[in-house]
Every structure is written in structure tokens, then in C-alpha cells.
Curated annotation (Swiss-Prot):
Its main location: host cell. It comes from Hepatitis B virus genotype A1 subtype adw2 (isolate South Africa/84/2001) (HBV-A). Keywords: Activation of host NF-kappa-B by virus, Activator, Apoptosis, Host cytoplasm, Host G2/M cell cycle arrest by virus, Host mitochondrion, Host nucleus, Host-virus interaction, Modulation of host cell cycle by virus, Transcription, Transcription regulation. May form homodimer. May interact with host CEBPA, CFLAR, CREB1, DDB1, E4F1, HBXIP, HSPD1/HSP60, NFKBIA, POLR2E and SMAD4. Interacts with host SMC5-SMC6 complex and induces its degradation. Interacts with host TRPC4AP; leading to prevent ubiquitination of TRPC4AP. Interacts with host PLSCR1; this interaction promotes ubiquitination and degradation of HBx and impairs HBx-mediated cell proliferation. A fraction may be phosphorylated in insect cells and HepG2 cells, a human hepatoblastoma cell line. Phosphorylated in vitro by host protein kinase C or mitogen-activated protein kinase. N-acetylated in insect cells. This is Protein X.
Length: 154
């Protein structure tokens, strides 16, 4: 079983939001490089937030009806895809954090829609899930592969 999420660009805040499909909530904005850091309050994620639905590599807040509170996962092994062949994405996000010219938010949105979610949802490649923490989520991972390299912008 896979958690189904979709991303939606909020151009007024330059934030890419991840939201659960069919959820009533508006979701949580991404942290760090794509917008202002938004620390979840203790009530933002209910105590029964779907840990029983755990999927390798996803933090427990990914299953909250409020949506995940920071971008932290990708189905691309070691962040490498046809679009991102040499670990370019972490460098791009780091440049954006520093306010330097980098990939536009529209390009980032296309990357996640076309590469990450296509591999994850359509191909169902759960085994390849890797976790990259890009901001201040307080939630622990359900499972993190020992070979996973973490990139943090915060």
C-alpha cells in the first residue's frame, strides 16, 4: 500500500505543498529552500497519525490528514534520475537557501511531479525510497535505510 500525495504550487508564497489525495486539509508547506520554515504545533499531527500505515522511508507525519510538514522523501535512488543524474538537486536547493540563482520553483515542481511521484506511485518502487530531510520536521522516520545519505538545509 502506498501513501498517495500530490504536490501543488502556492505561487504567492513560492512554496510547494505536499498534500494527501482526498484529504480535507490544506496540508503543510515545505520547509527551508522553497519557503518559510513552518514548525508544526503538537496539535498539527494527531496522536493516531497513521504510523500503522508505515511505508519504508517515510516519516509518520506523511500519513497525517494535515499532510507531511516538510519535504523529506524521494523514490530516486541516491537522488539520481534522468533529470538529476549527478546529485544536482541538493546543490540547487542549497543555492536557493543561500538566495543564489538556481532552478525555478516551476522546474522543481515539474521534477517532483514527473520523476519522484511517477516512480513512486505508478511504478510502485517502494524499495528504492530514500529519505532526504530538507527542513525542521520534528517527526521521526518510520524506517531509514542504513545506506541512506541525508542532506539537510536547516
Amino acid at each position: 500500500m502506498a501513501a498517495r500525495l500530490y504536490c501543488q504550487l502556492d505561487s504567492s508564497r513560492d512554496v510547494l505543498c505536499l498534500r494527501p489525495v482526498g484529504a480535507e486539509s490544506r496540508g503543510r508547506p515545505l520547509a527551508g529552500p522553497l519557503g518559510a520554515l513552518s514548525s508544526p504545533s503538537p496539535s498539527a499531527v494527531p496522536s493516531d497519525h497513521g504510523a500503522h500505515l508505515s511505508l519504508r522511508g517515510l516519516p509518520v507525519c506523511a500519513f497525517s490528514s494535515a499532510g507531511p510538514c516538510a519535504l523529506r522523501f524521494t523514490s530516486a535512488r541516491c537522488m539520481e534520475t534522468t533529470v538529476n543524474a549527478h546529485q544536482i538537486l541538493p546543490k540547487v536547493l542549497h543555492k536557493r537557501t543561500l538566495g543564489l540563482p538556481a532552478m525555478s520553483t516551476t522546474d522543481l515542481e515539474a521534477y517532483f511531479k514527473d520523476c519522484v511521484f511517477k516512480d513512486w506511485e505508478e511504478l510502485g518502487e517502494e524499495i528504492r525510497l530514500k529519505v532526504f530531510v530538507l527542513g525542521g520536521c520534528r517527526h521521526k522516520l518510520v524506517f531509514a535505510p542504513s545506506s541512506c545519505n541525508f542532506f539537510t538545509s536547516a
